[in-house]
């Protein structure tokens, strides 16, 4: 997993290439390490950037351990299937809590400046749907995203937030 996290932080390759390497050319963590060693260690500039990425991965792993959150690589069976099919899914997800609630997602999309009606709609929706096995998903943006997330949490519903910048 540390190799995948290092690959996440390795900015010299586009995400498309990283995913191609992970899913088409390697079968295991050891295969990935061997592949990267062959490709990266032949170029001093890439080698320095790879070492920086490994250091960032180490720091992030320690931070996750201290703060109690987990790191889920795209190769994990727990990685949300729906997220794998978007054009550019993240190599890793950072989270706190359980990954089991990522099934049956419902996202509410709206403005960053909701009206009273919009906020009330979020409250009523959370009240009505919290009795069902639905996972309220948001990006925690200001406005409707945050409102539905907060209301769902107040009702004890399962929630998942995907943060663009990580934790």
Outline where the language-model segments fall.
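Short, positively charged patches
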Residues: 1-127
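Phosphate/pyrophosphate-binding betaalpha-module
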Residues: 126, 133-137, 141-167
């Amino acid at each position: 997993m540390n190799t995948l996290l290092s690959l996440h932080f390795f900015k010299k390759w586009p995400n498309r290439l990283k995913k191609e390497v992970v899913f088409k050319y390697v079968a295991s963590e050891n295969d990935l390490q061997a592949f990267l060693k062959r490709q990266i260690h032949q170029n001093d500039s890439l080698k320095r950037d790879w070492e920086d990425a490994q250091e960032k991965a180490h720091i992030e792993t320690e931070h996750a351990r201290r703060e109690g959150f987990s790191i889920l690589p795209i190769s994990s069976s727990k990685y949300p299937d729906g997220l794998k099919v978007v054009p550019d899914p993240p190599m890793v997800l950072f989270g706190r809590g359980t990954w089991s609630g990522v099934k049956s997602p419902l996202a509410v999309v709206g403005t960053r400046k909701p009206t009273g009606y919009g906020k009330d709609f979020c409250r009523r929706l959370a009240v009505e749907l919290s009795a069902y096995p639905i996972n309220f998903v948001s990006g925690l943006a200001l406005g409707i995203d945050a409102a539905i997330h907060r209301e769902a949490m107040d009702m004890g519903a399962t929630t998942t937030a995907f943060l663009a910048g990580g934790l």
